[in-house]
Curated annotation (Swiss-Prot):
One of its GO terms (molecular function) is magnesium ion binding. Mg(2+) binds at N8, E375. InterPro entries: Ac/propionate_kinase, Aliphatic_acid_kin_short-chain, Aliphatic_acid_kinase_CS, ATPase_NBD. GO terms for biological process: acetate metabolic process; acetyl-CoA biosynthetic process. It is an enzyme of class 2 (transferase). The keyword Methyltransferase does not apply. Pathway: Metabolic intermediate biosynthesis; acetyl-CoA biosynthesis; acetyl-CoA from acetate: step 1/2. Substrate binds at R88. This is Acetate kinase. Pfam families: Acetate_kinase. It comes from Mycoplasmoides gallisepticum (strain R(low / passage 15 / clone 2)).
Length: 388
C-alpha cells in the first residue's frame, strides 16, 4: 500500500509521521541533536519503540537512520512504497497554497532563508536529501505562511520606510498557518457551516492568535518572524525595538546576540526561569506574575481580534500543547476578557475529550472550545491532493 511521509525539519532535529492511504499513522518519532551527538526516538503502530543514540553529522544521516528503522521494523519493505513526502516549510512569502517541489521551488525556499534563517535552510537541505534518497516520491512544500496570505494590507503592513518592504520584503507574514487551517476546517465540519468566524489561540511553546473571518485569516499575532506577538516559552513577543539597540550598547553584544536572547532566553523563561508552562503553573504563587503577563497578553489579542472580525463569532478556540491541556491558563485568560462576557462551565474541564470539547456554559455570549490540532494530517492531505 502507498504511504506518505510527513517531515518537520528543524535546525538540529527532524520530526516525522508515516501514514498509509487511509490516514492511519504507521510510525512517528524524531531525530534530534543533529551535528552534536545524535539521538532518536521512534514509535510504531504495533506499540513497539526504538530509541537510543546514533551519530548524526548532518540531516542526511538522520534521515537515512529513520528510513532504515522503518524497514527494520517492517513498516515498509522498500523505500519505493513512500510515494509522497510532505515538508513543513516555515517561510513561504507570497505562496498562497502548498506546492509540488520543483528545482525552481527548492531554489526559492533556499532564497527565502534570509527571512527565516533558523528554519528554511534546514528544511530545504532535508528536501534535497529526501529527493536523493527516495527519488520517485513526489515532494510537497506546505508553508506556515500560506494561510495568512488572505490578510488585508491593513493587517500585514508595517509603518516603515517603503524601501524596506519593496527591496527587503519586510512585512507581517504570520505563522502556524497549517494549524489554523486544520482548526478552521474542523469547525466547518463541527458546526455544519460553509464558513466560520473564529478567534483561535494556538498556545504551545511557540504561541500565536489568529482572527478568522469567513474561514479566512484576517490577522494574526506573529509578524515578520515568529518573535512578534504573544509571550512564549522562550520568546519575548511584542517589545519596543529600541531595546535591541540599547542592550547591545549596554552589554557589548552584537545585534544577532540580542535577538538570540529574545528568541531563546526570554518569554516564560525570562520572567520565571521556567520555559515550560507546566513548570510555571506548578510553582505558583511565586510565578503568578509570569502567569498574569502571559494571560493578559492573550486576552488583549482576543479582544483586539474579536473587534476586527466585527461579526457574529462562532467560537473562541484554544489549541496546541498549552491550549489543549492547561485548563488553568484558559480560565485565567477568560477572566481577563471582560468586554465579551464569557462564562465557563467548571464541569466541562472535568470531562475527558478526544478531539474537541465545549467549555462555555449557557450564559456565555461566546462559545469557548478546546480542539486538538493536527498539522501533520493537513500536510499529508496536501501531498495527496497535489500528487494526483
Amino acid at each position: 500500500m502507498n504511504k506518505i511521509l510527513v517531515i518537520n525539519a528543524g535546525s538540529s532535529s527532524i520530526k516525522f509521521q508515516l501514514y498509509d492511504a487511509n490516514e492511519k499513522v504507521l510510525a512517528k518519532g524524531l531525530c534530534e541533536r543533529i551535528f552534536i551527538d545524535g539521538a532518536f526516538k521512534y514509535e510504531f503502530e504495533d506499540g513497539s519503540k526504538d530509541e537510543g543514540n546514533s551519530a548524526f553529522p548532518t540531516h542526511k544521516e538522520a534521515l537515512t537512520h529513520l528510513l532504515e528503522s522503518l524497514k527494520k521494523h517492517k513498516v515498509i519493505n522498500d523505500l519505493s512504497e513512500i510515494v509522497g513526502v510532505g515538508h513543513r516549510v516555515v517561510q513561504g512569502a507570497y505562496w498562497t497554497d502548498s506546492t509540488l517541489i520543483t528545482p525552481q521551488v527548492l531554489e526559492k525556499i533556499y532564497e527565502l532563508a534570509k527571512l527565516a534563517p533558523l528554519h528554511n535552510k534546514p528544511e530545504a537541505d532535508v528536501i534535497d536529501v529526501v529527493q536523493k534518497l527516495i527519488p520517485k516520491a513526489k515532494n510537497v512544500a506546505v508553508f506556515d505562511t500560506s494561510f495568512h496570505t488572505s490578510m488585508p494590507e491593513v493587517a500585514y503592513e508595517y509603518a516603515i520606510p517603503r524601501e524596506w518592504k519593496e527591496k527587503h520584503l519586510v512585512r507581517r507574514y504570520g505563522y502556524h498557518g497549517t494549524s489554523y487551517r486544520y482548526v478552521t476546517k474542523r469547525f466547518e465540519q463541527l458546526l455544519n457551516k460553509k464558513a466560520v468566524n473564529l478567534v483561535i489561540c494556538h498556545l504551545g511553546n511557540g504561541a500565536s492568535i489568529a482572527a478568522i473571518k469567513d474561514s479566512k485569516s484576517i490577522n494574526t499575532s506573529m509578524g515578520f518572524t515568529p518573535l512578534e506577538g504573544l509571550v512564549m516559552g522562550t520568546r519575548s513577543g511584542d517589545i519596543d525595538p529600541s531595546v535591541v539597540q540599547y542592550i547591545a550598547k549596554q552589554t557589548n553584544k552584537t545585534l544577532d546576540q540580542v535577538i538570540d536572547d529574545l528568541n531563546k532566553k526570554s518569554g516564560l523563561l525570562g520572567l520565571s526561569s521556567y520555559a515550560d508552562m507546566r513548570d510555571v503553573t506548578s510553582n505558583l504563587p511565586k510565578t503568578q506574575l509570569t502567569l498574569d503577563v502571559y494571560t493578559q497578553r492573550v486576552a488583549d489579542y482576543i479582544l483586539k481580534y474579536a473587534n476586527q472580525i466585527n461579526a457574529s463569532i462562532d467560537g473562541l478556540v484554544f489549541t496546541a500543547g498549552v491550549g489543549e491541556n492547561a485548563s488553568l491558563i484558559i480560565q485565567e485568560v477568560v477572566n481577563k476578557v471582560h468586554l465579551l462576557k464569557v462564562s465557563l462551565d467548571p464541569k466541562a474541564f472535568e470531562q475527558k475529550y478526544s478531539d474537541y470539547r465545549k467549555l462555555s456554559d449557557d450564559k456565555s455570549q461566546l462559545n469557548v472550545y478546546q480542539v486538538r490540532t493536527n498539522e501533520e494530517i493537513m500536510i499529508m492531505r496536501d501531498v495527496v491532493r497535489l500528487s494526483k
